[in-house]
């Protein structure tokens, strides 16, 4: 039994499967006689006091502001590594996924605004369909096994990382509330201290962890969303070291990855995906927020990714990865419409102070759009890869 669990956890698809199970469990509880218990659990107040410092939030916000800061720390570490020595370390490597990611953010936002522009209650959610859930998307890709070209996986990963950078910028610029200058000054001091530690060659993680905690608290109190602290911390932690030394950034990334995959993201999905369908029907998908998010993910994402990629290649600003064709790019473009945890997260920011119905409709659009995108992409990519394999076998026999 233990061996079977270890084998499951070692599979690339395990993270995506756990996310699906977490979403299913949340939906089941939210629409069962246990709905009150589920909501009460999320509303449980959790208070931390240390002298004059007082942080008092419901459990749901500890998940969204605290655990997701660790997730964004992991994203920051991955982005930094890819920028320095990975899939984004040169113009030639980064050009195609960069154009694809830009298109994949612009088009969904335009589709959403097409249904919600001028609607004060809903137009603030324009960024919801701009996000891609990389864990879920890679999980779907992993279900296809070794048939998926490595270059196609790298393209999706690079695209999603650039997409994450875009989401980080969007959160910082558009979803920050009234700012506290005192807290921002403390945050700046913490950042400056970590930069100095890096420049002085300090490779021990403990001082970065202590200053990172101070930064998270300061950002939490500043009005800027606390998850951004994770990204800043990641960029301050040293990546390059002398030969024979262990990279603190790589060590932390490796250590955080299983926690993110098997605890943070499933817990976030469980806490945020519990949408009560009471009073909802198929007609609810026609609500502006639901329709904008659903079609933004289902149509806007693939159109943006594909059109911007095609234009970049035709204009010779980028080139297709070796061994990858347009059919495969098209299927992956649809897969980018899997927004799930990232879209739900942005929804929680966009409609934090709005009527409950608006946030619920946005989550409904996210769940339906993401599931349809994942299903279509899986079957499309299966067909494309089978066709490619058939052509390869024919060429070998001829």
UniProtKB/Swiss-Prot annotation:
Reactions this protein catalyses: Na(+)(in) + 2 H(+)(out) = Na(+)(out) + 2 H(+)(in)
UniProt entry tagged with the keyword Transport: yes
Principal subcellular localization: membrane
Pfam families cross-referenced by the UniProt entry: Na_H_antiport_1
UniProt-annotated location(s): Cell inner membrane
BP terms from Gene Ontology: regulation of pH
Gene3D superfamilies per UniProt: Na+/H+ antiporter like domain (1.20.1530.10)
UniProt keyword list: Antiport, Cell inner membrane, Cell membrane, Ion transport, Membrane, Sodium, Sodium transport, Transmembrane, Transmembrane helix, Transport
One GO cellular component term noted in the UniProt record for this chain: plasma membrane
Classification via InterPro entries: Na/H_antiporter_dom_sf, NhaA
Membrane-spanning intervals of the chain: 17-37, 59-79, 95-115, 125-145, 154-174, 179-199, 213-233, 262-282, 288-308, 331-351, 364-384
Entry membrane topology: Multi-pass membrane protein
GO molecular function, one term: sodium:proton antiporter activity
Domain of life where this protein originates: Bacteria
Role description: Na(+)/H(+) antiporter that extrudes sodium in exchange for external protons.
Record-stated family: Belongs to the NhaA Na(+)/H(+) (TC 2.A.33) antiporter family.
HAMAP family: NhaA
Protein name: Na(+)/H(+) antiporter NhaA 2
Natural source organism: Shewanella denitrificans (strain OS217 / ATCC BAA-1090 / DSM 15013)
């Amino acid at each position: 039994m233990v061996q079977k669990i270890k084998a499951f956890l070692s599979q690339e698809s395990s993270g995506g499967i756990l996310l699906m199970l977490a979403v299913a469990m949340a939906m089941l509880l939210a629409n069962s006689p246990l709905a009150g218990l589920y909501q009460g659990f999320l509303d449980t107040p959790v208070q931390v006091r240390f002298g004059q410092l007082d942080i008092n939030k419901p459990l749901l916000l500890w998940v969204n502001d605290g655990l997701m800061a660790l997730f964004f720390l992991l994203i920051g570490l991955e982005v930094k590594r890819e920028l320095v020595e990975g899939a984004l370390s040169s113009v030639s490597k980064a050009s195609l996924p960069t154009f694809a990611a830009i298109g994949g953010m612009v088009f969904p936002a335009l589709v959403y605004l097409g249904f919600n522009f001028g609607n004060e209650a809903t137009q603030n959610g324009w960024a919801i369909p701009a996000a891609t859930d990389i864990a879920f998307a890679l999980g779907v890709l992993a279900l296809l096994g070794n048939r998926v070209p490595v270059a196609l996986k790298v393209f999706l990963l690079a695209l999603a990382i650039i997409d994450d950078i875009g989401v980080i910028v969007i959160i910082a610029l558009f979803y920050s509330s009234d700012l506290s200058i005192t807290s921002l000054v403390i945050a700046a001091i913490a950042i400056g201290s970590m930069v100095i530690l890096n420049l002085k060659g300090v490779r021990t993680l403990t001082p970065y962890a202590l200053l990172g905690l101070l930064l998270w608290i300061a950002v939490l109190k500043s009005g800027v969303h606390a998850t951004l602290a994770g990204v800043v911390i990641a960029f301050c932690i040293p990546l390059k070291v002398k030969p024979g030394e262990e990279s603190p950034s790589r060590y932390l990334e490796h250590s955080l990855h299983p926690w993110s995959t098997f605890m943070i993201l499933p817990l976030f999905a469980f806490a945020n995906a519990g949408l009560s369908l009471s009073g909802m029907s198929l007609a609810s998908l026609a609500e502006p927020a639901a329709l904008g998010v659903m079609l933004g993910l289902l149509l806007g994402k693939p159109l943006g990714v594909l059109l911007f990629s095609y234009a970049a290649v035709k204009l010779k600003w980028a080139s297709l990865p070796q061994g990858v064709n347009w059919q495969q790019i098209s299927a992956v473009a649809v897969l980018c419409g899997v927004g799930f945890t990232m879209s739900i997260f942005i929804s929680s920011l966009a409609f934090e102070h709005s009527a409950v119905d608006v946030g619920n409709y946005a989550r409904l659009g996210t769940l339906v759009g993401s599931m349809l995108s994942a299903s279509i992409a899986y079957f499309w990519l299966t067909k494309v890869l089978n066709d490619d394999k058939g052509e390869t076998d024919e060429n070998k026999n001829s």
